Design a protein with these regions (language model features):
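Active-site anion/phosphate-binding pocket segments in diverse small-molecule metabolic enzymes
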Residues: 34-35, 54-56, 61, 72-79, ...
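Active-site-proximal beta-alpha core segment in soluble small-molecule metabolic enzymes
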Residues: 1-169
Length: 337
């Protein structure tokens, strides 16, 4: 399953999904029905699984656009069945067991009862059984092992009761890398699909980020020692210097927390962003180096011997690369090369 939620982790939902469909992906994973609807309207016909439990308002779209969904409550069963019956439809569902993350899913002790109830609704088809791993990116696998043990105990119980188990899925990107033997059935590829190794202690060869973000130098100005830059005057020049204005800001997903911390690559060299990042623009200290209006500016990517990816930026503000890529707003054009 290719996870394309949150605008394909910031890479562009439709652009990314169209390419993945042509490369043989089996199905897509989304968080919300609105994302699935966009895929269907773009002509994507592969199975789409909504990995966030549905609200009643989602069911119309689930039926109309043939969206599969995870479920974890009796209300889900009854409301899905009710609306499916009214539309003479069949809804494919994936039963979600909470093995310890405590975000979504039903208690493992309720597994048999839940599956028995599911099978009493003729217009619901059991298409999958799943859970979610909370610590698969950690080298300490004790909690992950506990979750897997609980999950497979539930599956074994169902087998002993004579149930044919549908598609099994619980491994995210880190889980697939950490415990490949448990990747049977289906894996839910997230950030690793976009070229990031989500586990620091295990090397994954030939995985490179597919995203680059570029801008251009919008204008140049010379400022004198003692003059300030941007809102709040958080940067005061300690010498005469050249400032380049770049048309990208926090309205595009460049966090204001990166002010006076991040650097961009221009003409094969890193230059620091100075002053507070604005909504639409930010400023870079060029010093006395040569620079021209319209020169390329690399925010994520490489030029010459310099490179920077979402992991590098995430480290600056003590967060995760997921937050960096998913924050990129829709006003940043997506282009496939």
């Amino acid at each position: 399953m290719a996870m394309v939620k949150a605008n394909a982790y910031g890479h562009g939902l439709i652009e990314t999904s169209t390419i993945l469909a042509s490369l043989g992906i089996d199905c897509f994973g989304v968080a919300f029905s609105s994302e699935a609807v966009l895929l269907r309207q773009a002509g994507i016909t592969l199975p789409i699984i909504m990995m966030t439990p549905p609200e009643d308002e989602d069911i119309y779209a689930i039926i109309k656009y043939s969206i599969e969904t995870v479920i974890c409550t009796e209300h889900h069963l009854r409301e899905l069945s009710k609306q499916a019956k009214e539309k003479n439809a069949l809804i494919k569902v994936h039963t979600y067991i909470d093995t310890g993350m405590h975000r979504d899913g039903f208690d493992p002790s309720h597994t048999l009862k839940f599956i028995e109830l599911l099978h009493s609704f003729s217009n619901l088809q059991w298409a999958g059984i799943c859970t979610h791993l909370a610590t698969s990116d950690s080298s300490d696998t004790s909690f992950m092992d506990k979750q897997l043990s609980i999950f497979y105990q539930c599956i074994e119980q169902l087998k002993q009761e004579g149930y044919t188990i549908p598609r099994i899925h619980m491994s995210n990107s880190a889980g697939m890398i950490r415990k490949p033997s448990y990747a049977a059935g289906m894996v839910r590829l997230g950030l690793s699909l976009y070229g990031y190794n989500v586990i620091g202690d295990i090397e994954v060869p030939n995985v490179l980020p597919v995203m680059s973000i570029e801008s251009r130098v919008l204008s140049l100005r010379r400022i004198k020692k003692g003059e300030s830059v941007s809102y709040g005057r958080s940067f005061i020049a300690d010498t005469d210097t050249t400032i380049a204005t770049i048309p990208i800001g926090y309205g595009d997903g460049l966090f204001r927390h990166l002010s006076n911390k991040i650097s961009f690559i221009i003409n094969g060299k890193f230059y620091p962003v100075i002053g507070n990042i604005c909504m639409d623009e930010c400023m870079v200290n060029i010093g006395d180096d040569p620079c021209s209006v319209s020169d390329r500016v690399i925010i994520i990517g490489s030029q010459g011997e310099c490179s920077q990816d979402a992991k590098d930026i995430a480290t600056i503000i003590d967060t995760i690369p997921y937050e960096i890529t998913t924050a990129i707003s829709n006003r940043v054009p997506r282009r496939i090369e």
